[in-house]
Amino acid sequence: MDVACGIMYDKAGNILMGLRDSRGPNPNYWEFPGGKREDGESLETCLQREWMEELNLHIEIEYLLCTTTNNNVICHFFVGKIIDTENLRINVHQYIGFYSKNDVYKLRLFEGDDKVVDMLK
């Protein structure tokens, strides 16, 4: 299963992180928002769709940072920027926040996501 995840910066240079719902899978972990690719969909289109569905935000994807594999899940991490936060709406996460790269390390991340953060400039 392919999953596209977005490491997206706001105009101040902070990364948007989402706190997963306490009742769903992997509860109370912080994540780079994204989701599963649908049949026939490119990873970039998947990521843009997921950000609209989950956060009501338009994003501009700049590049693929890395790809990781955990069990049968292949995560593709893209870096980019949020076009505008004015219409931000939380639809899936219990909370979202904007964090500096150093502050992202302090969050409860999925195993291995700290290594993804290490790759950021």
Predicted regions and their residues:
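Conserved N-terminal beta-strand and adjoining loop/helix that marks the start
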Residues: 1-15
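A short coil-to-beta-strand element that immediately follows conserved catalytic motifs
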Residues: 58-67
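NUDIX/MutT-family hydrolases
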Residues: 88-120
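Conserved Nudix-box catalytic region and its N-terminal flanking loop in Nudix hydrolases
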Residues: 14-49, 53
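Active-site-adjacent beta-strand/loop module that shapes the phosphate/pyrophosphate-binding cleft
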Residues: 10, 66-88, 95-97, 101-103
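Short loop/turn microsegments at loop-to-beta-strand junctions
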Residues: 3-4, 42, 94
